[in-house]
Amino acid sequence: MTIALGKVTKDENDLFDIMDDWLRRDRFVFVGWSGLLLFPCAYFAVGGWFTGTTFVTSWYTHGLASSYLEGCNFLTAAVSTPANSLAHSLLLLWGPEAQGDFTRWCQLGGLWTFVALHGAFGLIGFMLRQFELARSVQLRPYNAIAFSGPIAVFVSVFLIYPLGQSGWFFAPSFGVAAIFRFILFFQGFHNWTLNPFHMMGVAGVLGAALLCAIHGATVENTLFEDGDGANTFRAFNPTQAEETYSMVTANRFWSQIFGVAFSNKRWLHFFMLFVPVTGLWMSALGVVGLALNLRAYDFVSQEIRAAEDPEFETFYTKNILLNEGIRAWMAAQDQPHENLIFPEEVLPRGNAL
């Protein structure tokens, strides 16, 4: 017995096909399936930040003024973290803390969790957008893979670190001066600058900046002369499609400068991708370690000798004293709910004092 299987016909009005056709249609601003996550989350994250920095005080959570309404400027305004007593609560507007009261929700720090979570999902949506567009135009997904670096840093600093501590209170607040305070906090309480993961992150970011500058300058230096103008901007048409720089000339130049040079564009550009992304991932891993209060380098022998010998001091021991000073001065101001009091005689003094 023979059974003939015909082509299965789909309903012309299938909802998925209708949505897929509309979402992925060629338009000035691509939407895509990733846009269903990206655009709402980005809108709420940015809107929440503008709302918080404009109107919302941090008096109830940090004892601070943090909005334009209270006299702050762009550098000092912030959306502050919730109070330490709220631990890791999601602080939902309809949750047991705010009970649907929007004013109370803002006073408790609900905007911080709102901005942090919507911001994280917005960044993930942007990475998915790059995946989706790369697949549509048949590109490899390295743009999306590269963007995983900033996502890793954001998630580790704003979400994983406070999850390892006692609450969202110890995460960075969303503001310029607030981020600076958090950097000082990281140094004082974790000796972050001596952490090898931080060192790898700095090497990655600054190394990428150096590579960018060298690459841009080299391409400009080896452009073919295809015009009569006196300089780059007059001599070359910025809209031309063909490649007009010489990899061979660039290779010869850097071979003479360093003795070695990139032999092909694939390896060169992969290296420019690898350096910053690896640096960002390493720094993110380091922050995850700090969430667990892992220590990095402790040169105890130098600390013991400095304590015993007033004439012995190294840059390391001076930095350790500086960290103790940061902790002593910052903890009392930063955690007023703990009622910490440090008498003058216990504040750290270097051997030179």
Swiss-Prot record:
Q: Which SUPFAM superfamilies match?
A: Bacterial photosystem II reaction centre, L and M subunits (SSF81483)
Q: Name one GO biological process term.
A: photosynthetic electron transport in photosystem II
Give the EC number(s) under which this enzyme is classified. Answer: 1.10.3.9
Quote the cofactor binding remark: The D1/D2 heterodimer binds P680, chlorophylls that are the primary electron donor of PSII, and subsequent electron acceptors. It shares a non-heme iron and each subunit binds pheophytin, quinone, additional chlorophylls, carotenoids and lipids. There is also a Cl(-1) ion associated with D1 and D2, which is required for oxygen evolution. The PSII complex binds additional chlorophylls, carotenoids and specific lipids.
Which regions form coiled coils?
A: none
Q: Where does the chain bind pheophytin a?
A: Q130, N143
Name the UniProt key words of this record, in alphabetical order.
Acetylation, Chlorophyll, Chloroplast, Chromophore, Electron transport, Iron, Magnesium, Membrane, Metal-binding, Oxidoreductase, Phosphoprotein, Photosynthesis, Photosystem II, Plastid, Thylakoid, Transmembrane, Transmembrane helix, Transport
Annotated transmembrane regions: 41-61, 125-141, 153-166, 208-228, 279-295
- Catalytic activity from the UniProt record: 2 a plastoquinone + 4 hnu + 2 H2O = 2 a plastoquinol + O2
Principal location class: plastid
Membrane topology recorded in Swiss-Prot or TrEMBL: Multi-pass membrane protein
Positions that bind chlorophyll a PD2 = H198
A single GO molecular function, which one? chlorophyll binding
N-acetylthreonine PTM positions: T2
Q: Which GO terms describe its cellular component?
A: chloroplast thylakoid membrane; photosystem II
The positions annotated for binding Fe cation are H215, H269
Q: Where in the cell is it found?
A: Plastid, Chloroplast thylakoid membrane
Q: What class of enzyme is it?
A: oxidoreductase
Entry binding sites for a plastoquinone: H215, F262
Residues annotated to bind chlorophyll a ChlzD2: H118
Q: Which InterPro entries match?
A: D1/D2 (IPR055266), Photo_II_D1/D2_sf (IPR036854), Photo_RC_L/M (IPR000484), Photo_RC_L/M_CS (IPR055265), PSII_PsbD/D2 (IPR005868)
For this chain, the family text in UniProt reads: Belongs to the reaction center PufL/M/PsbA/D family.
Q: What else is known?
A: 2 of the reaction center chlorophylls (ChlD1 and ChlD2) are entirely coordinated by water.
Q: How does it assemble?
A: PSII is composed of 1 copy each of membrane proteins PsbA, PsbB, PsbC, PsbD, PsbE, PsbF, PsbH, PsbI, PsbJ, PsbK, PsbL, PsbM, PsbT, PsbX, PsbY, PsbZ, Psb30/Ycf12, at least 3 peripheral proteins of the oxygen-evolving complex and a large number of cofactors. It forms dimeric complexes.
Protein function:
Photosystem II (PSII) is a light-driven water:plastoquinone oxidoreductase that uses light energy to abstract electrons from H(2)O, generating O(2) and a proton gradient subsequently used for ATP formation. It consists of a core antenna complex that captures photons, and an electron transfer chain that converts photonic excitation into a charge separation. The D1/D2 (PsbA/PsbD) reaction center heterodimer binds P680, the primary electron donor of PSII as well as several subsequent electron acceptors. D2 is needed for assembly of a stable PSII complex.
**Name of the molecule in the record:** Photosystem II D2 protein
Which species does the entry assign this protein to? Answer: Fagopyrum esculentum subsp. ancestrale (Wild buckwheat)
